[in-house]
Amino acid sequence: MWDPDVYLAFSGHRNRPFYELVSRVGLERARRVVDLGCGPGHLTRYLARRWPGAVIEALDSSPEMVAAAAERGIDATTGDLRDWKPKPDTDVVVSNAALHWVPEHSDLLVRWVDELAPGSWIAVQIPGNFETPSHAAVRALARREPYAKLMRDIPFRVGAVVQSPAYYAELLMDTGCKVDVWETTYLHQLTGEHPVLDWITGSALVPVRERLSDESWQQFRQELIPLLNDAYPPRADGSTIFPFRRLFMVAEVGGARRSGG
């Protein structure tokens, strides 16, 4: 179960990639803007400001996130983004930190391009940090008893979930899109007693929490702390540097043909 409040604890750090992603969409006016994986809706509101007058459509798989979005005035729907189909007036599709949960997201991107009208835009940001020490520590601990039996079928994400920037660039170029693809590793300066644990509690540890009792969950967290502290030791000033790689792709549907590319 996703907890909007836990997820938003690091909103200042998590919001920046969204703004950098959307800033590269080169469309001044839009009829319909879609936020796939809208979360608690705090960033969806920015889309309404960026494209005033547009219909804002939002979707998330978590009922808790959709409820939080509704509290912010967002008319969000609970659903699976794999089932989403664009309406004819869709001009912009944004998916920020969601597609890594969908193993077949490459096929999904190609399908969206095929279903959207020329001149539409797709903007996607995907975390690409699944081989980092934080994820490796979670997987290693989950393989130990008493957790292994409870979590043996969790599809923990690994590096292969997210491909290289060149892969996505070629994938979208082959569909006739004009593309802008890049990656960035953010060096987040976190504070708090166990900041990396707190960060991943709002994201990577969500499927773990769903499998464990309250007592087992607290035990898992306590056993994870020394693993994370070894990988991300606090600095003398009390802060912790947390590197986080993210991949961005912005595509104008049919743009390559119109620009002669």
Swiss-Prot record:
Enzyme class: transferase
Keyword Methyltransferase tagged: yes
Protein name: Probable trans-aconitate 2-methyltransferase
UniProt xrefs under Pfam families: Methyltransf_25
Cellular component terms per the entry's GO annotation: cytoplasm
Species: Mycobacterium tuberculosis (strain ATCC 25618 / H37Rv)
Tagged with keyword Transport: no
Single Gene Ontology MF annotation: trans-aconitate 2-methyltransferase activity
